[in-house]
Amino acid sequence: MRILGIDPGLRVTGFGVIDQSGHTLSYVASGVIKTADADLPSRLGTIFEGISTLIRQHSPDQSAIEKVFVNVNPQSTLLLGQARGAAICGLVASGVPVAEYTALQLKQAVVGYGRATKEQMQQMVVRLLNLSGVPGTDAADALGMAICHAHGGTTLSTLGGIAPSLAKKGLRVRRGRLVG
């Protein structure tokens, strides 16, 4: 199964594509969709078109996107919601099923700790997908979203305390940290 993960943002929308075969996860692609300093409708159009292009290029079977959280700044929350809506429209228009997860679910599923830092997320994504380099935070969050969906949104502790791909390497997660 091929999964497209999306970390929505008005200026930068992260994306990550992985393949899942049983407990094995494989990296396919990741990156960002950047919007120019333009009016809001143009930015939303760029996000929609970017997602549509990714779907044509990678043919995902399913997708996962982060739910909007209420920020201190209501204007930022509204703008994020609109960017998220543009991404979801691109997915739905292409017939790709959409799953939604909170940031807490994402961090628990990938790191095993709901208050994990961006750096911890990046490191776990590198280890889970056996990457040679560290992706940027937006791409790492999007890859994490795809991993979260592959795990069914469950935490590492629900999966027996150890992600199967980490167990093969003799690693486990304790208090949000990777230990050997």
Curated annotation (Swiss-Prot):
Gene3D superfamilies: Ribonuclease H-like superfamily/Ribonuclease H. One of its GO terms (molecular function) is crossover junction DNA endonuclease activity. GO terms for cellular component: cytoplasm; Holliday junction resolvase complex. SUPFAM superfamilies: Ribonuclease H-like. One of its GO terms (biological process) is DNA repair. InterPro entries: RNaseH-like_sf, RNaseH_sf, X-over_junc_endoDNase_Mg_BS, X-over_junc_endoDNase_RuvC. It is found in: Cytoplasm. It catalyses: Endonucleolytic cleavage at a junction such as a reciprocal single-stranded crossover between two homologous DNA duplexes (Holliday junction). Keywords: Cytoplasm, DNA damage, DNA recombination, DNA repair, DNA-binding, Endonuclease, Hydrolase, Magnesium, Metal-binding, Nuclease. Its cofactor is Mg(2+). Mg(2+) 1 binds at residues 7, 138. It is an enzyme of class 3 (hydrolase). Mg(2+) 2 binds at residue 66. Binds 2 Mg(2+) ion per subunit. The active site is at 7, 66, 138. CDD domains: RuvC. Its EC number is 3.1.21.10. Belongs to the RuvC family. The RuvA-RuvB-RuvC complex processes Holliday junction (HJ) DNA during genetic recombination and DNA repair. Endonuclease that resolves HJ intermediates. Cleaves cruciform DNA by making single-stranded nicks across the HJ at symmetrical positions within the homologous arms, yielding a 5'-phosphate and a 3'-hydroxyl group; requires a central core of homology in the junction. The consensus cleavage sequence is 5'-(A/T)TT(C/G)-3'. Cleavage occurs on the 3'-side of the TT dinucleotide at the point of strand exchange. Homodimer which binds Holliday junction (HJ) DNA. The HJ becomes 2-fold symmetrical on binding to RuvC with unstacked arms; it has a different conformation from HJ DNA in complex with RuvA. In the full resolvosome a probable DNA-RuvA(4)-RuvB(12)-RuvC(2) complex forms which resolves the HJ. This is Crossover junction endodeoxyribonuclease RuvC. The gene is ruvC.
